[in-house]
A protein has these predicted regions:
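Intrinsic disorder/low-complexity segments in short proteins, especially the signal peptide
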Residues: 22-24
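A conserved ligand/cofactor-binding region detector
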Residues: 2-16, 20, 29, 35-974
Length: 974
């Protein structure tokens, strides 16, 4: 049995280190007094008895290895795991030879990197095995393309998925550390921001666990979004240098890079072919991150691109003459593409940088996909089979340029015709919509795109032109107003003249005379008229007849121009979401209510044209990270009462808990587990904020991106009302009326989103006042946890008792934090929006606190507001006045509170209906207090939330994508 083709000479322990029998084997051996790291794999299936052999670097002889503890030949048992001594040996080896730390001491940072690199050895072996096998059988792959991946820490997740938590914990104890301490040393990977990136990471975990052949593609951001600091001025942003000490999980592929071009010009060849030349050229370099599945050898790949230019671009002459900025201008210009996630786009420079990011992701990834497709195809490449081997899933509109880029590669590089390239592309690309917010349905300036990507604009214009003809074919030219309405909503290009071919078509098909009026006349009149006409025709001749025809054409052209006129005052735009729908074979929403809104409102015209394209795929989250690993206490209870740990990969088994919801023993265990988690949260809050909170209070949590539609403002306004009412009561009355609460917020506001940053400032000001009020004490605390990320979520969610998902109905596509909270037995208060609708159905209406207007009412309510018919609740007016009184400090909140007032105008008129839903929200919170006072009832609700959360596993979601969109099958390694 041959070894993997790499070995490392080292000095260390002679204890063999081996993997689970379904995986591989690593160890150390001594030949001629030289220590050697060897790697062993098994060719037989895990069910068969097998022997392991090791390749000796010096002699290439194969020798059987014996287990050091049992004396048996390695591999003669079906199941084995590495022991702690072997793992400790591996960690010490990496501490000495791999890490970039001083050799004098074995400090926590060094210990973490050595531990991570030890784990990475296992991942690389499984990664190699996975993709060697996929290459051999040439299986169809799903390629998930996303601008962000919010991975969180990888160490505990990796050792958990590999079933090595116990051995690693014991090994680290021998070395003077704990596995938990090592996990806390790891920084979160700053590759994402919110639900979009976290969903992508959950999907990769499920793809690996379920053995689906897939890759993820993204960008390797040097500084992420930003690190959030909370000061007296609110939120401040600083660069998050998560790569400062390196990333032990990534493998730089120096041999995998692709050219990416910007600007330049397009020239035509004598045969009509197009060539994009000149401009600015950079290279995208691959960094691979192996993603392990749970209890499986399958390890999928996340390939991240970093950008650079060749050293030839360094202007040494300029540097030596003192013009240092000019010397490395090209290098910095390339590198900055991957500096920051979502750079500010208020300026033209910011917009250009974002487009460069999006195109870099698309171009490098597609070149990589096609290169691998060609390699697997052998000498003869049949491009018609590309959709049978490749499916690209665009995670929102950021990767939209995949569509014109794939066409460009197929036509300009591979020599295919337009017809073939367009057909292949339409069968290879799928689109997931994540938002109904107009500002998030990306539009880009045609002028900017033309400057940056001239060849792609040609392709987009061609797609738009063909699509217009398809619309005309569908709706005809009989009603120009209807046609104009359809084109106005469906065209890819906005506020741009019709193509010449379309104008010509309309000229040839629209009748010049719209109607003919019938009148009664005598026969004698007809004869006289005919005679007169004949005489006039003889005199006028052909010249006058031509003038009449020209006049008719001019009238028709004017009519077309007036009907399909463009507004020169408005910019010409490219609608990326429309391009996704036109260029992809599938469009899916991410929750049932969201998918209905997509079909009925956002893309209704497209749905009428192509109903077969549209479907729903309700989001999910991985139960490995979000229950099994982040809440081990609860996981043990679930396993005990269900009777098996199979629920980790078959979440439907959680439903078994329903029959035990009233069991007093389970309820007691459940409450004790929750309290232990709350104590951890209280300690964490003190560490991060300095505030001391009581674990006896209800932990009420809203953690998510700060945005007006997510309505953190509604939450904090409700807290202000609660605080004001407390101040009006005596100490005894307060205790009787109010349940003690710790109100926890977390989330980042985009650096340029002024109103969201005002909300953060408001929350922190309220907290500073309430938390230092001796009259209130532990009855109410308000905490904003800074720099919210995956690791913070893993701490807060297990200890949460009430979670708030209170977006304006119809504006949240799905949400995934609501699913994580439900899995961990957290009762929810929310609107009928996004996945809330389905969560409420699954956990039971009695176990979900519902309030607020419904999605179908929102448009009418906004209209009423604009007409001045809305009458605010007196309690809402009371809170606004209280805020303006200065009780929470000297900050001027007029702009924030003013957004909730008036009937019209930008930034006014309470667009997100905080005032409308405020009374319903307060009444619902009263019901929450009542339920929490009866702990037995509350615990029952908590258990039923966990039991009803099984639908929201990303495993279920991925199975549906694989079956209905990607058409791929699981591939289990032999």
């Amino acid at each position: 049995m041959s070894a993997l083709p790499f070995s490392t000479i080292c000095r260390h322990s002679n204890t063999p280190l081996h993997l689970h029998s379904k995986s591989s084997f690593i160890g150390f051996d001594q030949r001629n007094n030289i220590w050697q790291l060897f790697v062993i794999t098994k060719s037989s299936s895990s069910r068969a008895v097998s022997k392991l052999s090791v390749k000796n670097v010096a002699s290439d002889k194969k020798e059987e290895l014996k287990e050091p503890l049992t004396g048996q030949v390695a591999g003669t048992t079906n199941e084995f795991v590495p022991d702690s001594t072997a793992i400790a040996s591996s960690i010490k080896y990496h501490a000495e030879f791999t890490t970039s730390f001083s050799p004098e001491k074995f400090d926590p940072s060094k210990a973490f990197f050595a531990t991570a690199e030890s784990v990475r050895d296992f991942l690389i072996i499984n990664w190699n095995a996975t993709y060697d096998y996929y290459e051999r059988i040439n299986v169809k792959h799903a390629y998930y393309m996303s601008m962000e991946y919010l991975q969180g820490r990888a160490l505990l997740n990796a050792v958990g998925n590999l079933e090595l938590s116990g051995p690693y914990a014991e090994a680290l104890r021998k070395l003077g550390y704990s596995l938990e301490d090592m996990g806390n040393q790891e920084p979160d990977a700053a590759l994402g921001n919110g639900g979009l990136g976290r969903l992508a990471s959950c999907f990769l975990d499920s793809l690996a666990t379920l053995n689906y052949p897939a890759w993820g593609y993204g960008l390797r951001y040097k500084y992420g979004l930003f690190k959030q600091l909370i000061t007296n001025d609110g939120q401040e942003e600083v660069a998050e240098d998560w790569l400062e000490m390196g990333n032990p999980w990534e493998i730089q592929r120096k041999d995998v890079s692709y050219p990416v071009r910007f600007y330049g010009e397009v020239i035509s060849g004598p045969d009509g072919s197009k060539q994009w030349i000149g401009g600015e050229n950079i290279s995208a370099v691959a960094y691979d991150v192996p993603i392990p599945g749970y209890k499986t050898r399958t390890t999928v790949n996340l390939r991240l691109w970093s950008t650079k230019v060749s050293t030839e671009e360094f202007d040494l002459q300029a540097f030596n003459t003192g013009d240092h900025a000019k010397a490395y201008a090209a290098m910095k210009n390339a590198e900055k593409i991957c500096y920051v996630l979502y750079p500010g786009d208020e300026s033209i420079e910011g917009k250009t940088l974002r487009l460069k990011q999006q195109y870099t992701l698309c171009s490098a990834s597609l070149q990589d996909i096609i290169a691998r497709f060609e390699k697997r195809s052998g000498r003869t490449v049949n491009w018609e089979t590309l959709p049978d081997k490749v499916v690209v899933q665009m995670n929102d509109t950021h990767p939209t340029l995949c569509i014109p880029e794939l066409i460009r590669i197929l036509i300009d590089v591979k020599g295919l015709s337009w017809e073939k390239a367009w057909d292949i592309t339409k069968r290879s690309v799928a689109y997931t919509n994540h938002t109904v917010l107009p500002e998030a349905l990306e539009k880009w300036s045609l002028t900017l795109l033309q400057d940056l990507l001239p060849r792609h604009v040609e392709i987009i214009r061609k797609i738009d032109e063909e699509f217009i003809h398809e619309i005309i074919s569908e709706y005809g030219t009989g009603d120009l107003n209807l046609l104009q309405e359809k084109l106005g909503k469906m065209r890819i290009l906005e506020n741009i003249e019709l193509p010449d071919s379309v104008v010509e078509l309309l000229n040839n098909t629209i009748p010049a005379v719209d109607s003919v009026e019938e009148i009664d006349v005598d026969d004698s009149d007809i004869e006289a008229t005919n005679k007169k006409d004949e005489d006039e025709e003889d005199e006028a001749g052909e010249e006058e007849q031509e003038e009449d025809n020209d006049g008719e054409d001019l009238v028709l052209e004017n009519k077309i121009e007036m009907t399909f006129k463009v507004d020169r005052k408005l910019p010409m735009m490219v609608r990326m979401a429309n391009l996704c729908v036109v260029g992809g074979f599938s469009v899916n929403g991410v929750a049932e209510i969201h998918s209905e809104i997509v079909k009925e409102e956002v893309f209704n015209e497209f749905y009428e044209l192509w109903p077969e394209k549209f479907q729903n795929k309700t989001n999910g989250v991985t139960p490995r990270r979000w229950i099994r690993f982040c809440n081990p206490d609860l996981s043990k209870i679930i396993t005990k009462w269900i009777g098996t740990e199979d629920w980790v990969t078959d979440l439907e088994k959680l439903a078994i808990l329903r029959k035990f919801a009233d069991n007093e023993d389970l309820q007691l265990e459940w409450m004790e587990s929750k309290r232990r988690n709350k104590i951890k949260v209280a300690s964490f809050i003190k560490e991060k904020t300095g505030y001391v909170v009581s674990p006896n209070a209800m932990f009420d949590v809203q953690v998510k991106r700060i945005h007006e539609y997510k309505r953190q403002l509604l939450n904090i306004m409700g807290i202000v009302y609660r605080y004001k009412k407390m101040k009006e009561l005596s100490a005894e009355e307060r205790k009787q009326v109010f349940v003690p609460r710790v109100c926890i917020f977390g989330g980042k506001a985009f650096a340029t989103y002024v109103q969201a940053k005002r909300i953060v400032k408001f929350i922190t000001d309220v907290g500073a006042t309430v938390n230092h009020d001796p009259e209130i004490g532990d009855l109410l605390k308000v905490v904003f946890v800074p720099d919210y990320n995956v690791s913070v979520a893993e701490m807060l969610i297990p200890g949460s008792e009430l979670s708030q998902h209170i977006s304006t109905a119809g504006m949240e596509a799905s949400g995934t934090s609501n699913m994580k909270f439900a899995m961990n037995g957290c009762v929810q208060i929310g609107t009928l929006d996004g996945a809330n609708v389905e969560i409420r159905e699954e956990v039971g209406e009695d176990n979900f606190f519902l309030f607020g207007a419904r999605a179908q009412e929102i448009a009418g309510l906004r209209k009423e507001r604009a007409e001045g018919k809305f009458v605010p609740d007196p309690r809402f007016e009371e809170v606004k006045s209280y805020v303006r009184s200065g009780v929470f400090g000297t900050y001027n909140y007029d702009d924030l509170i003013g957004s909730l007032e008036g009937n019209e105008g930008y930034g006014r008129a309470d667009y997100f209906l905080v005032g409308k839903d405020f009374p319903s929200y307060l009444e619902c919170q009263e019901e929450v207090d009542k339920a929490y006072r009866v702990q037995k009832k509350w615990t029952r609700m908590s258990i039923l939330n966990t039991a009803g959360s099984y639908k929201f596993s990303s495993d279920r979601t991925i199975h549906e994508y694989a079956r209905d969109i990607w058409r791929i099958e699981p591939v289990v390694l032999p």
